[in-house]
């Protein structure tokens, strides 16, 4: 396989130099299973596992390879397998908080150039969900593109596009109907040789259908959505990096029923640029935009310049991010405490001998 077509660039070359001198090879993670990875490399497709050392040193989920990662490998070509010794620095990473009570980062896709945020123009259409995806996209370091699928099922297309334009300020918006192959060509501009695009969206929005149309074959199984709620049945069960005939790469991901935010203030500001632009005009620097006198945001709401549901979405996400920061700080303090416990224990054991 050609590394350049797999997304290799100068960004990774410099980091790999010392490993090349030691005789290691490099590959890109295509599929992630529980304890095994499928890696694309010069030697072809390889089944790979991480070394015991890498597993021992990993303290959190993001220390393990994710789909899209460039990894340092030692190959056993006769067996068609490899051992993963490390991960090269990530150019970008699309992450969310793990589902459940744990405050941990889950990397959905790494080293992505563009993120297609796919939304169905049927019962799935939800501008608030788009806002949540946008925050994660801006945080990732990749460029977001809104893909509105199922245009053939929408009776108010112009109205839906206007709603998206209001929440995705300055973000490209593409409209298509994947099942009819209408508008698919508009996606190809982002899938030049060596470019990686991640498809993200809830189940049933047509991500696998889009992948199949771009691939020109049914590489991903497709199932109909349920009648009544327009929800899909999680056609894609594993994240997978797929090499397209054009030379571009696409990461198809399972539908996300729960979008847990993992981001910082800058991504919130980028997503809600209209509200952030109003904030400096408030009378008080620390204005919370509730009932304070001279609040420019509240004035914009009264005059109809700012949509109230968008403002409520902003407040909700702001609270989520503040809560996440507090949980991260608590987790860091606990980790530091555990670290010092281990150091003191090691020192006591040393003095005993």
UniProtKB/Swiss-Prot annotation:
Kindly list the cofactors needed.
Zn(2+)
Binding positions for GTP?
149-152, 201-209
Q: Explain how, and how many, cofactor molecules are bound.
A: Binds 1 zinc ion per subunit.
Residue positions binding Zn(2+): 282, 287, 289, 295
One biological process term from GO is: ribosomal small subunit biogenesis
Ranges for domain CP-type G = 102-259
Record localization: Cytoplasm
Q: Does the keyword rRNA-binding apply?
A: yes
- Its GO CC terms? cytoplasm
Query: Which keywords annotate this record?
Result: Cytoplasm, GTP-binding, Hydrolase, Metal-binding, Nucleotide-binding, Plasmid, Ribosome biogenesis, RNA-binding, rRNA-binding, Zinc
- Enzyme Commission (EC) number: 3.6.1.-
The reply on keyword Oxidoreductase is no
Q: Name one GO molecular function term.
A: rRNA binding
Recorded hits in NCBIfam families, A to Z, give: ribosome small subunit-dependent GTPase A
According to the record's subunit comment, the protein's assembly and interactions are:
Monomer. Associates with 30S ribosomal subunit, binds 16S rRNA.
**Role of this protein:** One of several proteins that assist in the late maturation steps of the functional core of the 30S ribosomal subunit. Helps release RbfA from mature subunits. May play a role in the assembly of ribosomal proteins into the subunit. Circularly permuted GTPase that catalyzes slow GTP hydrolysis, GTPase activity is stimulated by the 30S ribosomal subunit.
Assigned protein family: Belongs to the TRAFAC class YlqF/YawG GTPase family. RsgA subfamily.
Q: What is this protein called?
A: Small ribosomal subunit biogenesis GTPase RsgA 2
- Organism encoding this protein: Nostoc sp. (strain PCC 7120 / SAG 25.82 / UTEX 2576)
